[in-house]
Swiss-Prot record:
The lineage of its organism: Eukaryota, Fungi, Dikarya, Ascomycota, Taphrinomycotina. Its EC number is 3.4.24.64. It is found in: Mitochondrion matrix. Catalytic subunit of the essential mitochondrial processing protease (MPP), which cleaves the mitochondrial sequence off newly imported precursors proteins. Preferentially, cleaves after an arginine at position P2. Binds 1 zinc ion per subunit. It comes from the Eukaryota. Heterodimer of mas2 (alpha) and qcr1 (beta) subunits, forming the mitochondrial processing protease (MPP) in which mas2 is involved in substrate recognition and binding and qcr1 is the catalytic subunit. This is Probable mitochondrial-processing peptidase subunit beta. It comes from Schizosaccharomyces pombe (strain 972 / ATCC 24843) (Fission yeast). Pfam families: Peptidase_M16 (PF00675), Peptidase_M16_C (PF05193).
Length: 457
């Protein structure tokens, strides 16, 4: 028999490492610095986010933000394009950028000893970009080819049309790339003016995650970004800029009978980033779920809609979405089907499942909450993901919710919350419809709208 008294005593000789916290500092010029320090990390990601994307453009310069993203790595007043590339290749660092409707983001992922240089390069790119006339002409051709490729992608076209019809007459309804005529006509002066108007210190954040400490990044930010000037009328981070868009119940259809599929998006007005029911809308999205017929376990998914679609072969795939902006959002579903004779059935069962959200069961809500937790929290598995999360939250809400707070907020959602939000957001509300491809079988707008005009549950 094992004698427990002879076993060595278990003595804890270390302290549990405290969870990393987000530290925030605002410089004198209004620029915000936020960090999550991981002292044992050997790399760090530093991100510079600008609270300006295609929404900050006019009809004349629509496409400027994306154009500048292309020009970012083509050289500065201090570094040629070749020097920029060599500087990062020699240190093993990674540099990238992307543009959305409300933000433009530049970030660098580097080893610990190369982080200060990465910050210097990011500052050089954002504040000293040369934007030569020859580089503008070269990138113009690249962007035109990119637009040609995007125009061949049904999902991109559908979602651009969805924004255009839902936010008619508002900058949020414009595309990120801009129309072809703008791409062909934007000048160096137009791009420099966009930088002057929007790349202001109070509209920028620097976030990091990994090896660099908060104090060190603040010093680097003061050194390389301290000379930037704020806007004439300063707004706090996360504050809406410009008029709130009016959601318009409407549709855009682009019928192409040569297409093998119908591609359809249906949406209601969703939640902004700051809306108290933001997470409830995400839970509702998870209840509706995503489905693709290539998924081997599709008959056993928790989504009721996926079961119906799979059993009756109504679609190739569907994807629910909850897209948020500073003062509005789009909540809906994207459907792809080659069963063109049953499009009406597909739309009917989709909206019927939207209606069922007012009577969602506790089991459905708890399962969706678990899926949402996994989606939001398990994705924070790298310094780049964490830096992006910090930057996005600061730009959209003005503060960062810790993973623990996110988990708590999701955990507090009940089936009553889902029923209330579904009733307020979906029932008898206008919808925006965007459809591309072989859509002869998609019935008229009023027929689709009437499916959610009466609550029978």
């Amino acid at each position: 028999m094992l004698r427990l008294q002879n076993l060595p005593k278990l003595v804890r000789r270390f302290a549990t490492t405290a969870l990393p916290k987000t530290e925030t500092t605002t410089l004198k010029n209004g620029l915000t610095v936020a960090t999550e320090h991981h002292p044992y990390a050997q790399t760090a990601t530093v991100l510079v986010g600008v609270d300006a994307g295609s929404r900050a453009e006019t009809a004349k310069n629509n496409g400027a933000a994306h154009f500048l993203e292309h020009l970012a790595f083509k050289g500065t007043k201090n570094r040629s394009q070749k020097a920029l590339e060599l500087e990062f290749e020699n240190t093993g660092a990674h540099l990238n950028a992307y543009t959305s409707r409300e933000q433009t983001v530049y970030y660098a992922h580097a080893f610990k000893n190369a982080v200060p240089n990465a910050v210097a390069v990011l500052a050089d790119i954002l504040t000293n970009s040369s934007i030569s006339a020859s580089a503008v002409e070269r990138e113009r051709q690249v962007i035109l080819r990119e637009q040609e490729e995007v125009d061949k992608m049904a999902d991109e076209v559908v979602f651009d049309h969805l924004h255009a019809t839902a936010y008619q007459g508002h900058p949020l309804g414009r595309t990120i790339l801009g129309p072809k005529e703008n791409i062909e006509s934007l000048t160096r002066e137009d791009l420099l003016q966009y930088i002057k108007d929007n790349y202001r210190s109070d509209r920028m954040i620097i976030s990091s995650a990994g090896s660099i400490s908060h104090e060190e990044l603040v010093k680097l930010a003061e050194k390389y970004f301290g000379h930037l000037e704020p806007s004439a009328e300063q707004l706090s981070l996360g504050a809406p800029r410009g008029l709130k868009p009016r959601f318009v119940g409407s549709e855009i259809r682009a019928r192409d009978d040569d297409s093998p599929t119908a591609n359809i998006a249906i949406a209601v007005e969703g939640m902004s980033w700051k809306h108290p029911d933001y997470f409830t809308a995400l839970v509702m999205q998870a209840i509706i779920g995503n489905w693709d017929r290539a998924m081997g376990a599709s008959p056993h998914l928790s989504s009721r809609l996926s079961t119906i679609v799979q059993q009756h072969q109504l679609a190739n795939s569907f994807m629910s979405f909850s897209t948020s902006y500073s003062d509005t959002g789009l909540w809906g579903i994207y459907l792809v089907t080659e069963n063109l004779g049953r499009i009406d059935d597909l739309v009917h069962f989709t909206l019927q499942n939207w209606a069922r959200l007012t009577v969602a069961t506790r089991a459905e809500v708890e399962r969706a909450k678990a899926q949402l937790r996994a989606s939001l929290l398990l994705s924070l598995d790298s310094t780049t993901a964490i830096a992006e999360d910090i930057g996005r939250q600061l730009l959209t809400t003005g503060r960062r919710m810790s993973p623990q707070e996110v988990d708590l907020r999701i955990g507090q959602i009940t089936e009553k919350d889902v029923a209330r939000v579904a009733s307020e957001m979906i029932w008898d509300k206008d919808i925006a419809v965007s459809a591309v491809g072989s859509i002869e079988g998609l019935l008229d707008y009023n027929r689709i709208r009437s499916s959610i005009s009466m609550n029978r549950w």
